[in-house]
């Protein structure tokens, strides 16, 4: 049996997270983890070593950029899709500078 791809969804919006998690599970053989803030995201990253990170810009307390900076400092290699409802040029540019694979 092939290994399932592991995805970490880091978003504080519970309804959105449940909808996206269900959608991912229906469309593929994915194992989806969920984190609600930057600290929980970092903890899940180190515990489960996911292949993909779906990361919200507006996480409580420290925010998505804090997580990306942590990944960069630790030289943690992961495909990161940075999600934002505030797609300003500055936010998009900073996300890519910190290592985002894609910005939504």
Question: What are these model-derived regions, one by one?
Answer:
Residues 1-8, 12, 16-18:
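Non-catalytic signal-transmission and effector/linker regions of two-component phosphorelay proteins
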Residues 14-33:
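Two-component/phosphorelay signaling modules centered on CheY-like receiver
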Residues 34-52:
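Acidic, metal-coordinating helix/loop segments flanking the phosphotransfer/catalytic sites
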Residues 37, 63-66:
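Acidic catalytic/metal-coordinating carboxylates
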Residues 43, 65-76:
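Short amphipathic alpha-helix used as the core "switch/output" element in two-component signaling
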Residues 66, 87-104:
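Alpha4 helix (beta4-alpha4-beta5 surface) of REC/receiver domains from two-component response regulators
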